[in-house]
Amino acid sequence: RYLLISLIAGAVLLGAYSLFFIAPTYESTAKLYVVSASDDSVVNLSDLNLGTSLTADYEQLMLSYPVLNRVIDRLNLDSTSDELAKAFSLNNPSDTRILEITATSTDPQMAMDLAETMAEEAIDYLPDTMSTLAPNLAQPAKLPESKVAPSYTKFTIIGALLGLLICAA
């Protein structure tokens, strides 16, 4: 009987905690396609290899303070470049010249604005810095339809397990 009460109490307590005290977070992703075309405007193997190298360079420079400060200025944010960098994750899927820019925020509109603005500022700033052609916006950021965290189910199950452990102790 105490086992069941502990199970339910733990589940309810941690589930309620996650529902009322942990702000939901949202993610939005924009994608850039990085390819370099030769002077004759025909993409060849050398251009594709250069595009792959440029993608890795872009990935490193995207979170540099000049780009982040441009995002801060454009969106009138009250944060530092170091703080803003934590809102972004960059991913370059294997064997592609695609660069995924994912922004995370407690506001779905802000997540979309961050990802979209970062992509636009990268397209504008990085080619001049690197003396290359601008990447193409392959996918604009979109408004997230659902939260990515917290998982209420996960917290409820963990709470139930903690309730069982406390009862067993």
Place the predicted regions along the sequence by residue.
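Hydrophobic and amphipathic membrane-targeting/association helices
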Residues: 1-169
